Amino acid sequence: MYPQGRHPTPLQSGQPFKFSILEICDRIKEEFQFLQAQYHSLKLECEKLASEKTEMQRHYVMYYEMSYGLNIEMHKQAEIVKRLSGICAQIIPFLTQEHQQQVLQAVERAKQVTVGELNSLIGQQLQPLSHHAPPVPLTPRPAGLVGGSATGLLALSGALAAQAQLAAAVKEDRAGVEAEGSRVERAPSRSASPSPPESLVEEERPSGPGGGGKQRADEKEPSGPYESDEDKSDYNLVVDEDQPSEPPSPATTPCGKVPICIPARRDLVDSPASLASSLGSPLPRAKELILNDLPASTPASKSCDSSPPQDASTPGPSSASHLCQLAAKPAPSTDSVALRSPLTLSSPFTTSFSLGSHSTLNGDLSVPSSYVSLHLSPQVSSSVVYGRSPVMAFESHPHLRGSSVSSSLPSIPGGKPAYSFHVSADGQMQPVPFPSDALVGAGIPRHARQLHTLAHGEVVCAVTISGSTQHVYTGGKGCVKVWDVGQPGAKTPVAQLDCLNRDNYIRSCKLLPDGRSLIVGGEASTLSIWDLAAPTPRIKAELTSSAPACYALAVSPDAKVCFSCCSDGNIVVWDLQNQTMVRQFQGHTDGASCIDISDYGTRLWTGGLDNTVRCWDLREGRQLQQHDFSSQIFSLGHCPNQDWLAVGMESSNVEILHVRKPEKYQLHLHESCVLSLKFASCGRWFVSTGKDNLLNAWRTPYGASIFQSKESSSVLSCDISRNNKYIVTGSGDKKATVYEVVY
């Protein structure tokens, strides 16, 4: 279009100026440096604001805790004044008439304290502090604080805050130590959430409106009655008992106390069962195990099949019951989480574990740790009564009941629905094809035969059998009964060991390896150590902890140390020789419900109502592992000679975890909560019991069903003799059963 020899036209005055590449690079560099300077300035400003925010949060938390402390102190002083006034009223009549008038006038003058006098007193307290540090600016009073002493609360809070600042300035070099102390001391305060069991519900629920006053203890819900079964407590784990001649009022249990329990985190459908809480008592929020059964063994869950179990059974270990969905655990309360710090334990196993008597707030101000979570509203607790299921005959032969949803489950090559699944490291779940020797071989039982029935008379929450298999110990309400099972014939207890209080249930009893001592724990802060070698069994020592209840016990192989699972989530380590507490393992954020020892006494496994299983190193005094689940943990046991840990859950599943590899097995034969679990000493099999009245025997680790026995009520506890020849169970129909294992 244009000739190739065309000369370039000169630049006209109206054309834009052209930058060189170097100039453009310099311009970009200048702009980048400018933006970088702006970014640095904004970053410093952001860090400054974050620091100010942290400081304001610290001041707010300080004021928040002080307000609660002052409120408690106000009520305390009011109660003191009330009591002193009563004492004065009792003493004044003994004075002469003249002195009576003088004293009465003096008392009346003392009661007339004006607002001006209060302000003057507070001003006198503030005056010496004003020379050292200005008072901390205070935020408005949080909603929910009682305003009974509102006149001088803010001013007094300012005085305390100023005093705290002064203390911080004087003791600046100790701030780190005090802050650490604050974390150590405030960690136990999170136990306003978990709660211990208090008593067992023992009656049946009469038809009528009697059960309408039940309430729910949940950290996210306000107190008050609920209108429907689905809104009532989802902490349900129930066992039936014999019906009394006259059903008592549904408002109270026979002992007048609230129900106790390890909780189930699921709501009920088509069932009257629900759990009452015990927040009205001095104990923390009740999340408990109600030992009462549902009609027709209805699982305590809306996700489980609520139809009654079928009597028809299908022989063979490959039949299955239905799967229950795992219940998701609700998130913890924001308020309670914001005011607690984690606890680290690093002292050696033999070192005494000491805790101070007060907590510090950010190293500045001592505040009782109990003030932290007082925003949780107490709920008045009431007991509930339930209908019982029809009595089922004992079945010693292997049987597995059909399930209404079995057709939807994966199947094994034999064509029957599977109940055992292997879960790989990547979460893939596959049915387990059992090996040909799953149910045969040395040390594998064929079935169990009922040998003795021990009529304890109360719900049997704990059982153990002696090493000689001569005696069985059953724990119920307020006592442990000793039975001689070495002789045939009708059984009557040969001794009764009265423990705890008469109305408190025994939750665990453990024999020392020599069989000469028995340790008993339950719904009390005290553990009892019984001397069984004496002519008459007697208490030779008592161990007292700060927790209101003990859920489970374990004894070290050398019998020198005892471990107790407490309702506040702590694991207390006791020196049995000196009868002293030597350590506390703190990590569970809810009650610790079960415990076992592994690796020749060097590791401890605990399960909790916080949906976690934790492993502790007893030599180093620290937590090694933590396994999280979507269901509460009710029972566990470690295989004596293999690296497998069996866990029984509220969701009705039994999971077999490999403690060194990311693999596990899931077993789905139970139809409701798995309440107890025990390995045979050979490690080749174990048993589990549940609220579905079943005793299941499983092959380690893949869970082939060896045999299954049906009782007439929920089976709460179990034990296996040291020689693996006997199994003893405790149930909700006030009896224990001794089985002979047939090989």
Swiss-Prot record:
- Annotated region (SP domain) at 255-423
Q: Name one GO cellular component term.
A: focal adhesion
**A biological-process GO annotation:** animal organ morphogenesis
A Pfam family that this protein carries is TLE_N
Q: State the residue spans of region: Q domain.
A: 1-127
Q: Where in this protein does the record put region GP domain?
A: 128-191
Q: Where is this motif: Nuclear localization signal?
A: 214-217
**WD repeats: from-to residues:** 455-493, 501-540, 545-584, 587-626, 669-708, 710-742
Q: Write down which residues bear the modification named Phosphothreonine.
A: 253
Tissues with expression: In all tissues examined, mostly in heart, brain, and muscle.
Task: Identify residues that carry Phosphoserine.
Answer: 228, 249, 281
Region (CcN domain): which ranges?
Answer: 192-254
Q: Where in the cell is it found?
A: Nucleus
Q: Which domain of life is it from?
A: Eukaryota
GO MF entry, a single one: transcription corepressor activity
Tell me the subunit arrangement: Homooligomer and heterooligomer with other family members. Binds LEF1, TCF7, TCF7L1, TCF7L2, UTY, HES1 and HES5.
Please state which protein family the record places this protein in: Belongs to the WD repeat Groucho/TLE family.
Question: Know the name of this protein?
Answer: Transducin-like enhancer protein 2
- The scientific name of the source species is Homo sapiens (Human)
- Taxonomic lineage of this organism? Eukaryota, Metazoa, Chordata, Craniata, Vertebrata
